[in-house]
């Protein structure tokens, strides 16, 4: 006789804890924070991927802070403005004036890879490179926050009231490039970012194999669906870790010229095809292969490709249909009727497939239309892509349900492009936040803007919805400018160059690195020594004899008259 199975109480308790956690996750997702977020998985899926040991992450507190900051800017039609930070010095100086921090993959690639091998921004560095830089800066933020607290709690109330408080814990948004590979690579990268201190991460829609800086040529896009998978993978990892890390979706569709595949119908309307029937059966890849077999190389191959492209008369399918209608026999009114019908059926928001487009074209009488998107494929197999703001808008529509901000990479600071993109994306997703790269790759002086227009550029596009704006490489360029000009002057004038260019300017501007021992935390660790040794230490770093005492004394040196009343200066306590 079969015996009935009795479920042990331990199993029931396990299931009870699991279901309670599932309900907790579902309630979290139902909060205001995620009202715009779409997930193709369930709360049960997330909890199943978690371990039994619940963990918390400091970066989550900063992620919530970043979200509040950005939503406040969005509500006020203003922007969080920041730039790429290179090191702890920069990140602590930025904290006094800015409300977010950016960590650039370009800067890391050129100055701080985990292998110490520098190079251009091709995302070919180890995938822990940017997370390591995030940790470097996040540790510095926490350290200077601790140091400030010790300093302030050593002051009287009156002294604290006169000493500005600096919020060093500004949220960091980091460059996740393309996610560094497949789904599991993206998941592991995002886990690293959370553990290392990132409050936000951006991921772009370029191919991870051919990734380039957004302002280089030769960019290859992945299909819309593949990038959505990257965003979903990132969100899933954040959900598994129980964090609210801000996710930024970047598109390079404005300037991209190639795309990996034609698998997604949302990309079809931007893929280029050959329209010259004389090239039927003569693919570019085949022509180049024959030329290489014949011994041609370099410039000869390039000339052959240029000639083939010129002959191919590349067009999108819609352009091909439009031209065919306009060149067909018939009255002008008949042509206009067909053109209107085509435009109505093939508008960008409908994202019709090429197969659907061909069916519509045939119904309009275009039965023998020659258009072939395989013929112009590159030797690597990539399809030709017609990049545009509209292509970026279509991708923005697709990415918005899976991201918190949308970023369109551009080739110039163009207000018309910004306006078109913002209105286009918001026509479908009115509440989505937008991001903008105030790139140093732009020659701003050649943009046609006046100084006043440059000054107003950030607030102008902020009113369009670009509530997070950043100069990716300002830390890099500022570092280079200061060191180059100082080194040149120092070689010529010696110590006077240092005193005039740096020491006096630090003093004039209240820069706390003037007292660099204090800035680095000597007082803070003296407190440790004294605490361990009962309140006194003969080896305290900031004790009698420290040269930094010189910066607390009045002095009337010749040449210092421009630094204070009658040349007498008393350096106040550090702003820290």
From Swiss-Prot:
Binding site for Mg(2+): 175
Gene Ontology CC terms, in alphabetical order: glyoxysome
Cystine pairs: none
Record-level GO BP terms: glyoxylate cycle; tricarboxylic acid cycle
Coiled-coil region: none
Annotated pathway: Carbohydrate metabolism; glyoxylate cycle; (S)-malate from isocitrate: step 1/2
Catalyzed reactions: D-threo-isocitrate = glyoxylate + succinate
Swiss-Prot/TrEMBL keywords: Glyoxylate bypass, Glyoxysome, Lyase, Magnesium, Metal-binding, Peroxisome, Tricarboxylic acid cycle
GO molecular function, one term: isocitrate lyase activity
Keyword Magnesium included in the entry's annotation: yes
Active site residues according to the UniProt entry: 213 (proton acceptor)
Enzyme category, top tier: lyase
Cofactor(s) needed for function: Mg(2+)
Compartments (UniProt record): Glyoxysome
InterPro entries: ICL/PEPM, Isocitrate_lyase, Isocitrate_lyase_ph_CS, Pyrv/PenolPyrv_kinase-like_dom, Pyrv_kinase-like_dom_sf
Function: Involved in storage lipid mobilization during the growth of higher plant seedling.
Subunit structure: Homotetramer.
Name of the protein: Isocitrate lyase
Species of origin: Cucurbita maxima
């Amino acid at each position: 006789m079969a015996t009935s199975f009795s479920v042990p109480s331990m199993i029931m308790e396990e299931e009870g804890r699991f279901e309670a956690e599932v309900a907790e996750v579902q309630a979290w997702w139902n909060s205001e924070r995620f009202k715009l977020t779409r997930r193709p998985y369930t709360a049960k899926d997330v909890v199943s991927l978690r371990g039994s040991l619940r963990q918390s992450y400091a970066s989550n507190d900063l992620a919530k802070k970043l979200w509040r900051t950005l939503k406040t800017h969005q509500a006020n039609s203003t922007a969080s403005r920041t730039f790429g930070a290179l090191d702890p010095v920069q990140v602590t100086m930025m904290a006094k004036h800015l409300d977010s921090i950016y960590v650039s993959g370009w800067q890391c690639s050129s100055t701080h890879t985990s292998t110490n091998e520098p190079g251009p921004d091709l995302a070919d560095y180890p995938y822990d490179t940017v997370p390591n830089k995030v940790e470097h800066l996040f540790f510095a933020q926490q350290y200077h926050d601790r140091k400030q607290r010790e300093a302030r709690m050593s002051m009287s109330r009156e002294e604290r009231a006169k000493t500005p408080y600096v919020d060093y814990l500004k949220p960091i948004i980091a460059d996740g490039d393309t996610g560094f590979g497949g789904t599991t690579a993206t998941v592991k990268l995002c886990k690293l970012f959370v553990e290392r201190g990132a409050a936000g991460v951006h991921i772009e829609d370029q191919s991870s194999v051919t990734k380039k800086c957004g302002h280089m040529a030769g960019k290859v896009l992945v299909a819309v669906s593949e990038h959505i998978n990257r965003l979903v993978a990132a969100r899933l990892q954040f959900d598994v870790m129980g964090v609210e890390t801000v996710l930024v979706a970047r598109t390079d569709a404005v300037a991209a010229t190639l795309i990996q595949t034609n698998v997604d119908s949302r990309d079809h309307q931007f893929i280029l095809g050959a329209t010259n029937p004389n090239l039927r059966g003569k693919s570019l890849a085949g022509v180049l292969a024959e030329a290489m077999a014949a011994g041609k190389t370099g410039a000869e191959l390039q000339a052959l490709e240029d000639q083939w492209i010129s002959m191919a008369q590349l067009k999108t399918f819609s352009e091909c249909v439009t031209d065919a209608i306009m060149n067909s026999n018939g009255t002008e009114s008949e042509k206009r009727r067909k053109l209107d019908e085509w435009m109505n059926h093939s508008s960008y928001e409908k994202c019709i497939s090429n197969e659907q487009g061909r069916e519509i074209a045939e119904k309009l009488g275009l039965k023998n239309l020659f258009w072939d998107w395989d013929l112009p494929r590159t030797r690597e197999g990539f399809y030709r892509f017609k990049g545009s703001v509209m292509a970026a808008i279509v991708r923005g529509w697709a990415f918005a349900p899976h991201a918190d901000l949308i970023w369109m990479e551009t080739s110039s600071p163009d207000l018309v492009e910004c306006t078109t993109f913002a209105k286009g994306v918001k026509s479908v997703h009115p509440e989505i936040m937008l991001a903008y790269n105030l790139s140093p790759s732009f020659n701003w002086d050649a943009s046609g803007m006046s100084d006043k227009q440059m000054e107003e550029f950030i607030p102008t596009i902020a009113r369009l919805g670009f509530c997070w704006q950043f100069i990716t490489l300002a830390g890099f360029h500022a570092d280079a400018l200061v060191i180059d000009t100082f080194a040149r002057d120092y070689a010529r004038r010696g110590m006077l160059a240092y005193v005039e260019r740096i020491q006096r300017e630090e003093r004039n501007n209240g820069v706390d690195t003037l007292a660099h021992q204090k800035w680095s935390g000597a007082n803070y660790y003296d407190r440790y020594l004294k605490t361990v040794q009962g309140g006194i230490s003969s080896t305290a770093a900031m004790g009698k004899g420290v040269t930094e005492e010189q910066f607390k004394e009045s002095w009337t040196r010749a040449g210092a008259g421009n630094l204070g009343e009658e040349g007498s200066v008393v350096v106040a306590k550090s702003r820290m």
